[in-house]
Amino acid sequence: MSNVYDILKERGYIKQLTHEEEIRELLGKEKISFYIGFDPTADSLHVGHFLQMMVMAHMQKAGHRPIALVGGGTGMIGDPTGKTDMRKMMTKEQIEHNCNCFKKQLAKIIDFSEDKAIMVNNADWLLNLNYIEFLREIGVHFSVNKMLTAECFKSRLEKGLSFLEFNYMLMQGYDFLELNRKYNCVMELGGDDQWSNILAGVDLIRRKESKSAYGMTFTLLTNSEGKKMGKTESGALWLDPEKTSPYEFYQYWRNVADADVEKCLRLITFLPMDEVRRLSSLEGAEINEAKKVLAFEVTKLIHGEEEAQKAKIAAEALFGGNAKDLGNMPTAYIDKNDLNNLLVDLLVKCEIFPSKSEARRLIKQGGLYLNDEKVTDMNLVVTEEHVTEDGIMIRRGKKNFNRIVVE
């Protein structure tokens, strides 16, 4: 059986490692327990979490045991990583509800039967901590000077960082120590923005337990321009079908930029790498076949094959239908130079709306859709990324469609 380290490396997940050679050897010869933390700030996971789920699934397939740690305790503080402002604190009831939602979504691709994976809540040990004992046992091992050099704190020093949030690194380090003691968990995984927190936990275990512990971070899911993927005009791309419909989910991946197809196929599908390379090598109009495969595979993983099939059929009926279907749709033609302008200007130019004020009114009412994504930004600029193989699709309300073709 191939080493899962090599699979993760080939598919491009790995960003940073604490001990590269040791980790590769460990994953090849032993079955380990590892953990990834999830911050329960919403009642659904989103596409950013999906990458972490994929890593967990690859590791589990290789015989390793995932521990999904939900931050019911740390969630009451808030992780300052990547944030410019302090987060709103949540109630215990909110956190518990969100934890239950997470497990259902994780179970789509992670097997929780017979302890093959477990979910734990750090509230179980953090909420009963004795503050003096915690400072004596844990706080003594953390250098404030070193903590202040961590990226997650640097960006907050000028705007203000509360003592509450400053404790977050200690809490996360303590989580790793607890999981090591209770479940022999020897590795923490996370997005690259968690690197400083992961290092803190690895160092704490080595100091407290005189044992080896390891950390690995993986790349964030970004597009070719370096922006995080999974954001739509109406917000995050959620895994909950009530928040983001399977059709919207499918359409998002169907319309990714050509330059992002290969990365997405590698990171968020289980397609063999030979197939990923074949699909990624398609050029011109053929790349749309790769996008259809990507959209179907990702939607199937999250929403099941039946919903993926429905989304595919619905998309083909509207967007990829035969010429007769598209010919019946009101169509306006624009020049490539007309792109990179405000959507409201384009809608008036194409005579879809008589005035910009009417277009803005429908946006305000929540009834205007661009490529089946609700438009919420009055100042949305239409770029080449919005152009699908059949043009730019505009929907007003539920059934009024227009097509803009770029010549």
UniProtKB/Swiss-Prot annotation:
This is Tyrosine--tRNA ligase. It comes from Clostridium botulinum (strain Langeland / NCTC 10281 / Type F). It is an enzyme of class 6 (ligase). Disulfide bonds: none annotated. Homodimer. ATP binds at K231. Its EC number is 6.1.1.1. PROSITE patterns: AA_TRNA_LIGASE_I, S4. InterPro entries: aa-tRNA-synth_I_CS (IPR001412), aa-tRNA-synth_Ic (IPR002305), Rossmann-like_a/b/a_fold (IPR014729), S4_RNA-bd_sf (IPR036986), SYY-like_C (IPR054608), Tyr-tRNA-ligase (IPR002307), Tyr-tRNA-ligase_bac-type (IPR024088), Tyr-tRNA-ligase_bac_1 (IPR024107). GO terms for molecular function: ATP binding; RNA binding; tyrosine-tRNA ligase activity. Gene3D superfamilies: HUPs, RNA-binding S4 domain, Tyrosyl-Transfer RNA Synthetase. It catalyses: tRNA(Tyr) + L-tyrosine + ATP = L-tyrosyl-tRNA(Tyr) + AMP + diphosphate + H(+). Residues 341-405 form the S4 RNA-binding domain. L-tyrosine binds at Y35, Y168, Q172. CDD domains: S4, TyrRS_core.
